[in-house]
Amino acid sequence: MLELSAKGQFAEDQAKTFKRLADMIRRTAEYKHVRVIGVTGSQFHNSGSTIVQELAFTLAAGHEYLVKLMDEGLTVDQVARKIRFQMAVSSNYFMEMAKFRAARMLWANIVEAYKPERQCSAKMFTHAETSRWNQTVYDPYINMLRGTTEAMSAAIAGIHSLEVVPFDAAFEKPTDFADRIARNVQLLLKHESHFDQVVDPAGGSYYIENLTDSIANEAWKLFREIEEKGGYTAAYESGFIVERVKASAAAKDKNIATRREILLGANQYPNFTEVAGKELTEAAVTRPVSEGNTLAPYRGSMAFEAMRLHVDRSGKAPKAFMLTCGSLAMARARAQFSCNFFACAGIKVIDNTFFKSIEEGVKAALESKAEIVVVCASDDDLSLIHISEPT
């Protein structure tokens, strides 16, 4: 199913694929811990889908494997116990806990509809991968914090295995240091926080239980909609799935552009003094274009990063001078907003605590030779300032 979303078509005839999978299941029947079918859901998340969409589309793909392989003469028990689900985990802390809990509940409902002989066949095996969509190439050490909170969400949610993406994976081959930190996050959660010692630690929490029910209900509605269209493959080939993901991605992009959704280090609180290193290439900040009915994973911060990299590599960094005057509290508040605004584009910021008069500020601004001067003051103070064009 992964190749369908990446290329828009299967690499080989579907009938041959499922016959081959059925043969693999029979050959590995005695190896109870070997799972030969991987259902990948992180592709949806990393392409901009919502949590509900990722869950519904992943379940639909898993159900299609179940049905097609049962048509090859296998029982529901034989197939279900060979499926491994892989989903992304974002920084939406409690929502991600609820997503994995909802996934287990819904998958159990799907499998039990086919009346398995063993109840354990309805158990979902889940692998989580920390988000690549929200990683940033500027101020990359923030990615360590993202990966840690995401790993914690997944562990509390009760996943079986976990991959923490190294903090520098977005722009280079991970260094030994980045790989070590990624591994140690899991070890710390296990050996120091003991998250592996409690079964469903989120169980009983009204907030998380309520979130779980809400996500499960919405995902089930979307799952049924996919089934009504003929199943995962039919829904995908009709463009239904790709259109839904692209619409969600567009909404996320708008929220990031307007800073309704915050990506630290990219569209809010950037490192003012950071300059892109040689390891950062234009390809790392260029959003891939999806061709036809395909999904193209990207990172939410790419638009800001591309703009900033262009400024960094231009040879001359423009400067923005903060001319703060009038009411101190409002002047500093607007200066902070303006500093963040310009720094997101890689423009060098010259911040100033406060000027006693507009004349003093103008003199300092002219001496700085900044290309941009931002007057930071309250609305009332701004109405008293007269700025004339140079003659």
Annotate the PLM regions:
Residues 143-164, 168, 203-205, 231-235, ...:
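Conserved phosphate/anionic-ligand binding catalytic regions in large, soluble enzymes, centered on
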Residues 192-215, 219-220, 229:
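Long, amphipathic alpha-helical stalk/connector segments used for oligomerization, subunit docking
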Residues 1-154, 167-183:
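Helix-rich catalytic cores of soluble enzyme domains
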Residues 160, 221-318:
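Intrinsic disorder at enzyme termini
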Residues 320-375:
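Generic long, charged, amphipathic alpha-helical segments
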Residues 37-42, 86-90, 127-131, 147, ...:
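Generic beta-strand/beta-sheet core signal
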Residues 385-390:
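Residue-level detector of conserved catalytic or cofactor/ligand-binding positions
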